[in-house]
Amino acid sequence: MVRTRIQRLLTGINRRMMKLLIALALIAYVASVWGNFVNMSKSIQENGEQKMEKKIEEVIAPLREKIQNLERSFTQKYPPVKFLSEKDRKRILITGGAGFVGSHLTDKLMMDGHEVTVVDNFFTGRKRNVEHWIGHENFELINHDVVEPLYIEVDQIYHLASPASPPNYMYNPIKTLKTNTIGTLNMLGLAKRVGARLLLASTSEVYGDPEVHPQSEEYWGHVNPIGPRACYDEGKRVAETMCYAYMKQEGVEVRVARIFNTFGPRMHMNDGRVVSNFILQALQGEQLTVYGSGEQTRAFQYVSDLVNGLVALMNSNVSSPVNLGNPQEHSIVQFARLIKQLVGSGGEISFLSEAQDDPQRRKPDIRKAKLLLGWEPVVPLEEGLNKTIHYFRKELEHQANNQYIPKPKPARVKKGRTRHN
C-alpha cells in the first residue's frame, strides 16, 4: 500500500515535471520567437532608418548646396570698384540696364564708383547680364516696365529701354511704340520731378535709308513712316522730339545719342542682326545668308567704345544730338567673309532677295563727337569680333545639353524681311 502511494506520488511528480518541462520548452520557444521578432523588427527599423536617412539626404542635399551658394554670394568678390566721395558719387538710373548695351553701361558706372539702379522688364534683357552685381551695396535691380510711372530719387537717367532687334520690335510693334513714347514721357516726367539729367539712347535708324553720306547730325533723314520697321524708327524720332520739348518748356537737361551699329558680348545670338547672324551661322557650319547683293555698307563699333561715348556725352554740356559710331565702312559681303575667316569655319555665302527698306549705305559722321566730347572708337574691328565670337562659343557650349538653339531667321512680316542692321 505504501508502495502504491509512492508510485502515485512519483507519477504526480513526473506529470508536474513534464508540465514544467513543457512549460519551460514553450517559454524557450516563445523567447526564441520573440528574439527573432525583435531582431527582425530591429533590422526592419534599421533598414527603414537607412531609407529615411537616404530620403532626408536627397531633400537636404540641394538645400545644402543652395546655402553654400548663398554663403559664397555673401563673400563673393565683385569687380573692382572705385571709391568716390559723397560729393562725386552719383545716383544713376539705367532703363533697359539688363540688356546688351545697358549691362555694359552698368559695369562701367559701377566700377567708376556710382550708385546704379537698373530698371528692366526683361522683355529682351536678361538677369544674368547683371547678376555679378547683385548684392553689392551700390547696386539695385528693379523689375519694372517704363510704360508705368516710376518714383525714385536719382541724379542721372540713361534711358535705354526699347527692343532694338528687328524680330523683337516687329513681333510687338505696339509695345515698341509704347516704350519709346509713353516710356520716354515717364522718364522725362521723372527727370523733371527730381531735377535729373536724361540721356536718350536714340538710333541711326532716325536717318532711315539716307540720301546723304556719311550721315551728320544735321541730316533730317529719309524714313518710311508705315514700313515694317516704322515702330522703331518713328518711335525714336518722336522720343527725340519729346526730349527737346521738355528741355524747351520744362527746363529738363537732355542728351541725345544717335547710336550706330554696335556689337559685342551679351548680344542675343538669335536677335536677327547681321553680326549675330553671321557668327552663329559660321560657328554652326551653315551658309552665311546675305540679303540683296551684299554691297550694302555698314559701320560697326564695339560695345565698350559706345559705352565710353555715352558716359562722355552724359557728362558734357552738349544738348544737341550726337552720332556715336565707327566711321570705318564695310560692305555686308566683306563682313561675312571676315567673320568666316575669324571663326575658321562656316559654309558658303548665299544670297537671298533684298529686304524691304534696307538702307544701302550707312556711315556716321563723328566730327561732332571728336570735337565736343573728345571721343572716337578705339577697339579694332577684328579684336572686337574675336571677343564676340569667343562669347558666342561659350553660349553654344552652355546651351548644348539638348537645348534647341533657333537658327537665325528674318522676322515674318507682311511685306519684306529684316534688314542688315
From Swiss-Prot:
Protein EC: 4.1.1.35
Pathway: Nucleotide-sugar biosynthesis; UDP-alpha-D-xylose biosynthesis; UDP-alpha-D-xylose from UDP-alpha-D-glucuronate: step 1/1
GO terms, biological process: D-xylose metabolic process; UDP-D-xylose biosynthetic process
Region (Disordered): 400-421
Biased composition (Basic residues): 409-421
Membrane topology label: Single-pass type II membrane protein
Transmembrane region(s): 20-40
CDD domains xref list: UGD_SDR_e (cd05230)
Binding-site residues, NAD(+): 99-101, 120-121, 123-125, 145-146, 160, 162, 179, 201, 232, 236, 262, 268, 273
Residue numbers annotated as active site: 232
Catalytic activity field: UDP-alpha-D-glucuronate + H(+) = UDP-alpha-D-xylose + CO2
Any one GO MF annotation of this record: NAD+ binding
Pfam family, any one: GDP_Man_Dehyd
Gene Ontology CC: one annotated term: Golgi cisterna membrane
Glycosylation sites per record: 317, 386
Chain ranges on the Cytoplasmic side, renumbered to this chain: 1-19
Cofactor: NAD(+)
Record carries keyword NAD: yes
Assembly and oligomerization: Homodimer and homotetramer.
Protein's name in the database: UDP-glucuronic acid decarboxylase 1
Organism (species): Xenopus tropicalis (Western clawed frog)
